[in-house]
């Protein structure tokens, strides 16, 4: 199949393919929307002769968190209602479609570790070992008014971590490869979950408190050494670690590739159209049913020609925008509408309690051709009272690194407009380089940022899956840091709800959107 699936065919105006058929419209071309389309086409009640699906995406497939995520999969993720199903479906999809080659699926080991990367500790080790360590990555520059996302010891409200499942590609296409505001949310952060697991599994070094930091680290490595094949980390700086999962419970994939592949399989049926446009409103009738929407067609400049090259080399390939002065186009032959818009859901449903958490990430080409397959959730001591908490995911040809989230800016109009704070990316690269010579001697490939969809209710971590209190209007959103992990289950369950009238593969009554907001309040 090659990588032809990375460039799906699209249109900007509705086709006539839905005439005389049950027409299901999915708003949002991220991993949730694409998995929903795929599992609809796989449902035994679905037939291209009687059903048609239109995916409406404002900018590009997997242009947000679905393309910018780390891609960590874990059987111990949340929520428990759908995680076992989704983890199993990921394996089944890989087995069926050669996920190892098509979207870099593989099982791996996940660890949590604490390391001391203070300058004095590093200098002491180098002096004692008589081995110099040259850090090739300079400290990040701070712009005026910029404060990093490190948090002080004792803070009980550190910002929600952006996970390996839900994160990052630069603010444009992935085709070309004040103070921090802490988030108060019922959603547990990935770091809080793993720290809890670490406390229950690790060999504590608390009995070493009376000795020097260097001696502590040396003693810890004697009694609790890191796995031998985790050789791209400076193990002498690690003072505690824990296994969070082996190949039986954790895996990874490249989310951008996966999303495009699964969409291509849905479109192969001939029953799925991809429409580029920005949905600007839904229309309810007097019975609180919704069967029509309006959208602004996206304008695409500099498309690829028949040879796959840009038509105009002076314009960025695939530049997309919406003409806000254009007359909206109405689609009114819809039987069911699914909103899988992630943090943009509340742009349409004003009462929906889903907001966005911005997360930065970088990808690094390591100095070694390959690094051993580990996902690492780190807590780095950077000075006497500050920690920094990056996550590192070794891919086949690069290492993905992400940091904690922030709410410093509002959600922009599209995923292309997400502001990337270069200093945050530089900070990520600087601190992980202290821990890894392989990364320090490598080179930075990409700086990027995206928004994660967070459900802001005290009684649920999300997501919301199912029909709203508006008939035939459905939502699949609010997956927080586990959107990549839980996408197949969400897609399968949505297909059951849309075609059978109920979810049968998992019990998800607690994820019912009707419990949390009023969908009749439209934009």
Curated annotation (Swiss-Prot):
Keyword presence, Transport: yes
One cellular component term from this protein's GO annotations in UniProt: cytosol
Example GO BP: retrograde transport, endosome to Golgi
Keyword Cell membrane: no
GO molecular function annotation: oxidoreductase activity
Subcellular location: Cytoplasm; Late endosome
Gene3D superfamilies: FAD/NAD(P)-binding domain (3.50.50.60)
Region (Disordered) residue spans: 157-189
Disruption phenotype: Leads to cell death when overexpressing the camptothecin mimetic TOP1-T(722)A mutant.
Sites bearing Phosphoserine, chain numbering: 189, 204, 306
Ranges of Low complexity composition bias in the record: 157-172
Quaternary structure annotation from Swiss-Prot or TrEMBL: Interacts with BTN2.
Function of the molecule: Putative oxidoreductase that negatively regulates the retrieval of cargo from late endosomes to the Golgi. Regulates YIF1 and KEX2 localization. Required for fast DNA replication.
Other facts noted in the record for this chain: Present with 5240 molecules/cell in log phase SD medium.
Protein's name according to its UniProt entry: Putative oxidoreductase TDA3
Species of provenance: Saccharomyces cerevisiae (strain ATCC 204508 / S288c) (Baker's yeast)
């Amino acid at each position: 199949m090659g990588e032809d699936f990375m460039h799906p065919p699209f249109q900007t105006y509705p086709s006539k393919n839905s005439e005389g058929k049950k027409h299901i419209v999915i708003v949002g071309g991220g991993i949730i929307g694409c998995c929903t389309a795929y599992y609809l086409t796989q449902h035994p009640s679905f037939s291209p002769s009687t059903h048609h699906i239109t995916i409406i995406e404002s900018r590009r497939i997997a242009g947000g968190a679905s393309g910018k995520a780390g891609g960590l999969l874990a059987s111990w993720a949340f929520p428990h209602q759908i995680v076992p199903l989704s983890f199993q479906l990921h394996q089944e999809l890989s087995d069926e479609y050669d996920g190892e080659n098509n979207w870099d699926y593989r099982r791996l080991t996940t660890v949590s570790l604490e390391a001391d990367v203070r300058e004095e500790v590093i200098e002491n080790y180098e002096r004692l070992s008589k081995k110099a360590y040259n850090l090739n990555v300079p400290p990040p520059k701070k712009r005026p008014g910029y404060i990093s996302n490190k948090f002080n010891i004792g803070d009980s409200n550190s910002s929600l971590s952006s996970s390996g499942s839900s994160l990052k590609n630069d603010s444009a296409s992935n085709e070309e490869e004040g103070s921090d505001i802490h988030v108060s949310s019922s959603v547990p952060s990935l770091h809080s979950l793993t720290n809890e697991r670490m406390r229950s599994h690790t060999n504590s070094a608390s009995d070493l408190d009376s000795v020097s930091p260097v001696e502590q680290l040396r003693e810890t490595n004697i009694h609790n050494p890191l796995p031998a094949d985790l050789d791209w980390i400076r193990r002498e700086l690690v003072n505690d670690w824990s296994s969070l999962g082996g190949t039986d419970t954790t895996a990874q994939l490249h989310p951008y590739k996966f999303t495009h592949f699964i969409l291509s399989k849905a479109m192969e049926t001939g029953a799925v159209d991809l429409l580029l446009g920005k949905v600007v409103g839904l229309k309810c009738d007097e019975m609180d049913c919704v069967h029509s929407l309006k959208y602004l067609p996206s304008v695409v400049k500099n498309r690829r020609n028949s040879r796959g090259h840009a038509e105009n080399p002076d314009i960025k390939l695939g530049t997309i925008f919406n003409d806000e002065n254009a007359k909206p186009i109405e689609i009114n032959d819809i039987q069911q509408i699914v909103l899988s818009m992630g943090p943009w859901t509340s742009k349409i449903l004003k009462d929906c309690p889903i907001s966005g958490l911005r997360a930065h990430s970088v990808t690094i080409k390591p100095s070694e051709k390959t690094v051993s397959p580990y996902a690492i959730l780190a807590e780095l001591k950077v000075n006497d009272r500050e920690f920094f908490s990056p996550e590192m995911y070794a891919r086949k040809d690069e290492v993905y690194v992400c940091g904690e989230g922030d709410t410093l800016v509002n959600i922009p109009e599209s995923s292309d407009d997400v502001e990337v704070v270069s200093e945050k990316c530089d900070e990520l690269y600087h601190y992980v380089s202290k821990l890894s010579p392989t990364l320090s001697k490598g080179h930075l490939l990409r700086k990027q940022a995206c928004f994660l969809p967070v459900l802001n209710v005290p009684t649920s971590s999300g997501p919301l899956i199912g029909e709203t209190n508006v008939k035939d209007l459905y939502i699949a959103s609010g997956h927080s840091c586990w959107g990549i992990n839980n996408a197949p289950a969400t897609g399968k369950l949505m297909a059951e709800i849309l075609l059978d009238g109920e979810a049968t593969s998992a019990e998800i009554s607690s994820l019912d959107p009707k419990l949390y907001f009023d969908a009749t309040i439209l934009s």
